[in-house]
Amino acid sequence: MTGIGDLFRSIAIYREWTFGGRTKARAPQPTDLPADFLLPDASNLALVLHELVQRSATRKKLIDYLKRFYAAAEQIATRIHGGTVQLFIDEGMDDFVPATRLSDGTLRYLSLLAILCHPTPPPIVCIEEPELGLHPDVLPTIAELLKDASLRTQLVVTTHSDALVSALSDIPEAIVVCEPSPDGTQLRRLDRESLAEWLDRYSLGEIWRMGEIGGTRW
């Protein structure tokens, strides 16, 4: 049973994405928290990003993706003082924006970067609705991050976003449709060949909205 317990403990699950004004992700964080991977409540976000930016390749990747969302960002910065670490975005010219002033969406995006750009993630990572709080035009970037991270870990992602699904039109087989039935929830993986003619004319999200792949409310 120890092996099974260790396996379950190695699964990273992100279900509650709350980044309001009093959340731990905004506040200075104790330096004795784990720094290897993001905790479910993102309470060690500053510590994880502090570790990741020490690696040149990962730092470049983080900044490149951050600039797609936050054009003014030059660097991800952290300050360690009095046993705590605080997160900032460096906009250049000594203009450091603390996590306490960042939008909910920016903190959510930084958390996704901390998860999806990590070079050595846990073996299984589960993320519920990564699109929440983000502008639809950034969802293709989220899809790109998901594809990249899936090369290093098994990702399980839930979504209600047709924009995010559309951004995965090139890999329809990655989508599993969940539907209720009298016998319980049914899971069905999409098949590229059966959708080929549809995908010649429409994105996967459009096909979903048309009701052609299931996963609808009716």
Kindly give the residue locations of the regions a language model identified.
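Conserved D-loop-proximal element of ABC-family nucleotide-binding domains
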Residues: 132-136, 140
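C-terminal lobe/lid and adjacent interdomain/linker elements of RecA-like ASCE P-loop ATPase modules
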Residues: 141-218
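Phosphate-coordinating catalytic segments in nucleotide- and nucleic-acid-processing enzymes
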Residues: 1-109, 113-120, 213-215
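Gly/Ser/Thr-rich active-site loops/lids in small-molecule metabolic enzymes
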Residues: 105-108, 135, 190
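Walker B catalytic acidic pair
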Residues: 128-129
